């Protein structure tokens, strides 16, 4: 699973911190031929984009944050509450030797708690260095998102303390390389993986994760609903350099053999403790699906399309009781604060079709999520809020404006949104359009959609298509927000294009191998890579060639 080859002419370099000597931030250096000694880009690939790294799925990857966590002296080693079993566990026993830690005192062990108490953690310095790649001074954008000359560790601390940003960083996932989610930082993307009752297994899902992070996924969600959920998640976490998210209600339902009526808070509590001990960095919790809101979704074209939302709605109606995720929310906060698991407050009533966008059910839930944001903050927990869904372009901005107002500027994390319903097989495109727009307006993280959306379980090629589509959307949003590092890369590639430096164009792109292979189809070999034209226009009609001749005159 070495993906360093997907970036020819690139190498991994490490930038050392100033506040903490053991902070070394991995970035990718692209070699280009115009005399520039280095071009650094943000890199999410961890060891998978490092040619020098030794990879072994059975051992897991390096535990980058172990010393930082131990040095804070607010956690201690404990025994697992849940002991994994099964053949897959035996096969990967080395990775299972991860030391389990839990809160040792009375205060939360969260990045929010540290930030609010004036502490700049190594994680905060790490993300400041990552965000600073190629930044230069620009003003703030019209959307209100700050584009600062420099992202300092103190600025990161302030954003975390205010709740405008989060660093998902479970104390039991020391392998993760810290990253920040907030609208005053680079727009991030998430890739969903996971098995179903029909398809996939451990090796396949770990390969999907590795490919996703190599191509730029900032976080990965394991949405497994089939068999062996615990062990699949274990090997994903032990091998993941990015934060891992889950929807715990899926495994809780699996524990009661798929019978929604048999769910209980006790089963759910056991599940989130199990997953927190493994190292899951954020949980999607559908606590805003209240019993009285369900009736508002009955007249929709597509009803309730969130799996978690539908599960909780069915449970509420079966028992004629309020959602137990809502009634036990304080206890959930206490558990999550003990491991620094961040909340991703799920939009269980999100619209699943254009006709249902921005309806009463959606915004009633959003108001409740805003109230729960404050409860989570009160407990010292980090929190972001999930959003739609299926929304036509003219209604997208309203979603961002309402979320900022109702949720006190907690980071927004949206699935797309898909801007039309007519393109099954191409929903990575329909959704990337909406994702670029809502990212521009202020969404902090975009959940990818693959070509298989609405059609089936994504395979590894679908994962790549989804990641690349959303890297484009996030980058377009960063450009619109005035982020200087986004402009720097566009400028460098445009220069290479005008100079007919074909290899530099390929290597500065999001997917160099694909760019080169498409060029090779018509102009293969060394001659094609020195030509001052491409097969579209040929040597006589190339506008850039003609323009360059004018400049040279």
Curated annotation (Swiss-Prot):
Q: What Enzyme Commission number(s) apply to this enzyme?
A: 4.1.99.17
* Disulfide topology: none
Q: Which residues bind substrate?
A: 192, 221, 250, 286, 306-308, 347-350, 386, 413
Please tell me which top-level EC class this enzyme sits in: lyase
Coiled coil located at which positions? none
Locate the residues binding Zn(2+): 390, 454
Q: How is the cofactor bound?
A: Binds 1 [4Fe-4S] cluster per subunit. The cluster is coordinated with 3 cysteines and an exchangeable S-adenosyl-L-methionine.
Q: Which molecular-function annotations from GO does this UniProt entry contain?
A: 4 iron, 4 sulfur cluster binding; carbon-carbon lyase activity; zinc ion binding
Tell me the InterPro entries matching this sequence.
ThiC, ThiC-associated_dom, ThiC/Bza_core_dom, ThiC/BzaA/B
Which reaction equations make up its catalytic activity?
Answer: 5-amino-1-(5-phospho-beta-D-ribosyl)imidazole + S-adenosyl-L-methionine = 4-amino-2-methyl-5-(phosphooxymethyl)pyrimidine + CO + 5'-deoxyadenosine + formate + L-methionine + 3 H(+)
Look up the domain of life of the source: Bacteria
> Pfam families per the record?
ThiC-associated, ThiC_Rad_SAM
- Biological process (GO) annotations? thiamine biosynthetic process; thiamine diphosphate biosynthetic process
Residue ranges spanning the membrane: these are: none
Q: Could you say which cofactors this protein requires?
A: [4Fe-4S] cluster
Described by its record, this protein's role is as follows: Catalyzes the synthesis of the hydroxymethylpyrimidine phosphate (HMP-P) moiety of thiamine from aminoimidazole ribotide (AIR) in a radical S-adenosyl-L-methionine (SAM)-dependent reaction.
The identity of this protein, by name, is Phosphomethylpyrimidine synthase
| Species name | Anaplasma marginale (strain St. Maries)
